[in-house]
Amino acid sequence: VFRLQGGAFPGAPMEFTAMCAFAPYNLENVKQIGYDVLSNRPKQAAYRAPGSPMAAFAVESIIDELCNRLKLDPIDVRLKNASKEGTKASFGPKWDRIGLVECLEAAKQHPHYSAPLTNGQGRGVSSGFWFNHGGETAVTLALSEDGTAALSVGTPDIGGSRASMCQMAAEELGIPYDKVRTTIADTATLGYNEVSHGSRVTYASGLATIKAARDAVKKLCARAAKKWNIDEEAVIWEDGFAKPSGPNAGDFEPIPLAKLTKSMGRTGGPIVGHFEATPEGAGVSFATHIVDAEVDQETGRAHVVRYTVVQDAGKAIHPSYVEGQYQGGAAQGIGWALNEE
């Protein structure tokens, strides 16, 4: 039974709490009851995987307490019961390939887990789950005569998504990263985009960016085909160059993107790629954290001594930004645990 404080109005993220609570575990029988409890406090709002940290705190604390009483290794217990590919989640679907087992194994092998503790220190282990979704998304990519690209997206950057989308566009076009500029456009400029929430931005807008870049590449190939007087299907795009293929391979000198865009005013006008979609499904992620905390036995003050994050990142588009998200999430979790009621 979960009870979440909703504040003065209903709306606590009970659905997500129930989805996340037992997601890391292979359990044949699960029954969850959730209550959205009204209280004399301000209305709640979504914040950092709404509902998931509360669920993890409840379930993972119980698992650690159980392991402590039975003298069991907390990671071994989690490994024995971990969700893996083919496991049916407590809320219905079967998992595809997921990385929870790998996270647990990496955590157990990490030097932190076997490091000695001193008097007044304790060690906690926790696994957690979150997911993202698609939502309505539209992206436009316009090429300039100087060979640069202007990417317009409708999702505000709250986690480094602009840098990631610049990377994806640059990779598809075959041009340097600094040749792509991303602008956050409004609804009047671009069309409707769902808001930046639910960890959806790089997932959905990133996919749309790739598709918009490929749309632009298709048009670049058409311009090259026009120059060479061959079929569009006989042109491929490789490393930022239009190249003849098939029977025409080697017959013409490859044309770089900047040369094609420089002449686009004379070969058909602006080259703009566009894509809009509502991606379905969800990308899921699991993590395991190890924390050493120390309590001052005279004052009762607690502070974190050591913190290790192991997470299944999937494809880390911008690794340093992904690491920053790990650090930020850990810092916010520490804040919740030690500084907030």
Task: Give, region by region, the residue ranges found by the protein language model.
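Short, charged, surface-exposed loops that flank catalytic or proteolytic processing sites
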Residues: 67-76, 223-228
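Gly/Pro-rich active-site capping loops and adjacent beta-alpha segments
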Residues: 1-55, 117-341
